[in-house]
Design a protein with these regions (language model features):
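Phosphate/adenylate-binding glycine loop and adjacent helical scaffold
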Residues: 112
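Protein maturation boundaries and topogenic segments
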Residues: 1-79, 99-102, 131, 137-163
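Juxtamembrane cytosolic face of transmembrane helices
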Residues: 34, 116, 120-121
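Short beta-strands and strand-coil junctions in structured, solvent-facing domains, enriched
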Residues: 58, 92-93, 117-118
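Short coil-to-beta-strand transition motifs
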Residues: 77-87, 125-127, 131
Length: 163
């Protein structure tokens, strides 16, 4: 009995270390996410498995055009997947309401790529930055669609002018 207890006691630091490493990795560096609706099609399809990284959110490294996971403003238990279209200080055209909206300090504007099937900032307005969870870094599944998400043309920077 004593040797069993001693054996378990020797393994506890390794188990605690492993659990701590896994927690920190998934909490601060990367994790897995699954898109559960059609609002981001064709970029991300219903059921796609993606690699997500909270690092970009935690260090405020997001850019317009990034796809993000965010807590729903209507149901904090629900997580939504949308494209970051506007950041603080931006003016965004809301085609649902037919006018421009200003994104205040500490807020973001999210929209789905599949606009006809997306409930997003066009419906509920700008969101607090604090609702962001992570950036979608890579599509993992299905294998035939594996890869980085392409940034739509409207978010790409024009090439520098040559003189």
């Amino acid at each position: 009995m004593a040797s069993t207890f001693a054996s378990v006691r020797r393994k506890v630091p390794y188990v605690v270390s492993g659990i701590s490493t896994c927690y920190c990795t998934f909490r601060f560096i990367c994790g897995l996410g699954k898109c559960e609706d059609v609002s981001m099609e064709p970029t991300i399809q219903h059921g796609d498995l993606v690699l997500i990284s909270p690092y970009y959110v935690n260090h405020q490294l997001l850019q317009k055009g990034d796809v993000v996971f965010c807590r729903s403003p209507k149901n904090p238990r629900a997580i939504i997947c949308k494209r970051l279209v506007g950041m603080e200080g931006d003016t965004v055209y809301n085609d649902e309401k037919g006018f421009e909206e200003y994104v205040d300090k500490g807020q973001i504007w999210l929209e789905g790529d599949n606009k006809c099937c997306s409930i997003d900032s066009r419906t509920f307005g700008p969101l607090p930055y604090g609702l962001l969870i992570s950036k979608v870094a890579l599509r993992l599944w299905p294998p035939e669609r594996f890869g980085f998400l392409e940034l739509p043309k409207r978010f790409r920077m024009p090439p520098p002018c040559s003189t």
